Amino acid sequence: MTVRPFTLSRRALVLAASLAIAPLTQAADAPRVLFKTSAGDFTIEVYPDKAPKTVENFLQYVRDKHYDGTIFHRVIPTFMVQGGGFDQNYQQKPTRAAIEHEGRAALAKGGLRNVVGTVAMARTNAPNSATSQFFINVADNAFLDPVPIPDGDPVAKFEYQGRVHENVPRAQLLAAPQLYGYTVFGKVVAGMDVVQKIKAVPTGPGGPFPTDAPQTPILIQSATLVK
């Protein structure tokens, strides 16, 4: 099964225009992971106080050396770069069980949104399906953020994608897959220039992907917990 972070049309992707990268602040006690790749090195910082299950899942894959020898298999320069699931032969690596989606809970705790430089879990259309794959936002992708559900039951008024819905059962909104968004659990704090280099590589067919696969493989040589 191919794990992708979205099921959006190419037209929708174009709407996520690439923006200038602002300096990223760093948290003193947050764990950091150094990725050494064939394009250079970058470091991400992760936030267990915002998305504890997601971060622990990711760090366990790091400790298990799951990411070593995998590739960035999907690159869309106006959107994101995705990796963590396939080796150089486009064989999908075995994973542990999928984890619970923490997007809404993370935002409620002041977590990050899907903006340039942040790192989120990839998944299928099922909200609770993330395993090892992750993506780095290379544009501000607000449409990937969890949609907040207003108070009340039923919800008196709910607006989504230009349509207004009235008196909707709260449970129905909370369960709607399209409102879950994608869980952001970290951000790039060093080496964003390397991520920019990755997003600029020529892409085309590769493995199970008809488009968006780097034509020169971008290999993750190692991912190491450095803090």
Model feature map: region roles:
Residues T2-F6, L24-K227:
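Cyclophilin-like peptidyl-prolyl cis-trans isomerases
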Residues L8-V14, L19:
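N-terminal export leaders
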